[in-house]
């Protein structure tokens, strides 16, 4: 759910307040859009009543609101790898879930690389070093990376619990000494690593977060509902590009084998009702590879590996007009 602290009169009042002196009541589209941005910055996202059942949530919102139906939502063809980049645009190359299988990937031309997590199998330092070497071999001007549930050593609370409980479900990770993993992020010297943090490149504000709904007790897992919402509430308004490891509800989150939607309802409401980024990149659900759009945000599930962990899905290319202030 979401609610707002404003009533219908606020849009008119804020648009009027944003008018230059002497223009009276002549509302331009830019003033109305500015007022709408003010409105969205005041939206408060609450835990959805269907939070614990994303498949039911999808059905409810689709039937009652048409929220996932054309023309509101549609599949989108990614930019061909050999297409020329339009003047004044920045080319983003999006990948996710490479799982230490980067050798077969044919990386296309671009300006900024985005990796949405699961670049290793278990987050072992040796895997991170190998991934960092691969990053260093790539020619992109910027390389932005977040962790996923497979980067176990990047989740310090997970590691503390793992060692404390003497739990050997992940034996190779459990045997690591704290000094081997406490600063594992420092091994990523060839990229910008984001974890509930933001960076601005080429004028684009980019925010990254690794969290996702509980998934068999891996890294960066949180219960659906309030715990995840608190993480999404950290995402600031005005972000141009959002990177999360898991998908929002209804966008490239379908798991055919289980006949279930597995995306996060609170992430969907945060993206659509409050943040409204131009681009949202994620992975995690290997079966969901592809691109969708809702008229405001382009959603990219950039999972390179299939459900059988074969690295056959090509990187997804997205061109965005470069902000004028870059």
UniProtKB/Swiss-Prot annotation:
The record's account of tissue expression is: Expressed predominantly in adult brain.
Identify the keywords attached in UniProt to this record, alphabetized: Hydrolase
Q: What EC number(s) does the entry state?
A: 3.1.-.-
Q: Name one GO molecular function term.
A: hydrolase activity
SUPFAM superfamilies per the UniProt record, alphabetical: Metallo-dependent phosphatases (SSF56300)
Any stretches that span the bilayer, and where are they?
none
Do you know which InterPro entries this protein is assigned to? Calcineurin-like_Pesterase, Calcineurin-like_PHP_ApaH, Metallo-depent_PP-like, UPF0046_metallophosphoest
Q: Which Pfam family name is an example for this entry?
A: Metallophos
Alphabetical list of Gene3D superfamilies matching this protein: 3.60.21.10
Query: Tell me, what does this protein do in biology?
Result: May have metallophosphoesterase activity (in vitro).
Family indicated by similarity: Belongs to the UPF0046 family.
Q: What's the protein name?
A: Metallophosphoesterase domain-containing protein 1
